[in-house]
Amino acid sequence: MVVSQIPKAAGFMYALVMIGVIAYLWYSGRWRQKLGWLLLVISAFLGFLIFSPVAPWQFQQLVLRDVQGLGAPLIVGVIGLFVVLVLTFIFGRFFCGYLCPVGTVQEIASHAPVPKVNLRQKKMFMVIRAGFFIVFLLMAFLLSASFLAYFGIRDFFYLVLTAGTVVFIGVLVLSMTFYRPFCRLVCPYAVLLSLGAWKGLFKLQRTDACIECKKCENACPTDEAKRGDGKAECYLCGRCTDICPVAGALKYDRVGGRT
């Protein structure tokens, strides 16, 4: 289904514009979950239509210096991925949450009405992902090999049935019970974006209106809702704000801003 005539840069332009739009809507209090669902569907569709902005894969092709696989000149790829990283540092992980097709199909799957497994092992998951990141770099620089090919990302969105496609379908099935397994355990680009979000300028924060009911902590699938959490693994999914019983107790704002 992927239309090769449409430049992959179009997907990144969509993402860069929408990061700013989503951040504004969150900041102004105008964000609605219905809009979130619309973006999830659009972004997933773009994955199948133009295979962009599939940042994990394009980041890998950039490291491999594979211009053909990247779908754009190397300098364009560098600029695009760097700008996404900068915007994540400013606004948080809206790209991962609503715009990357790999993330959006997992997010959609996570809403399946089945029992959830919510392991409070955030640091361990980040260590596992860092280990995969090292493997990713070793395979790229020493073997010029595609680490992500084993997870079938490209084959899945190109609608090609391979062993890798089956693996990625398995990831989606797992996503129904365990939130975003690829993003949290495997994605090499997420290593960089999580660092950006951890030091980010804007985050979801509790205000003085919080009554410490801990409903947000119980609802958060990545264990990032406690006071003092760095929000490195916060995908702005909205589960915490949806369940919060006090208006204004959770706000998306500049760090050190409105309370």
Language model regions located:
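Non-ligating segments of multi-cofactor redox enzymes
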Residues: 1-223, 233, 241-259
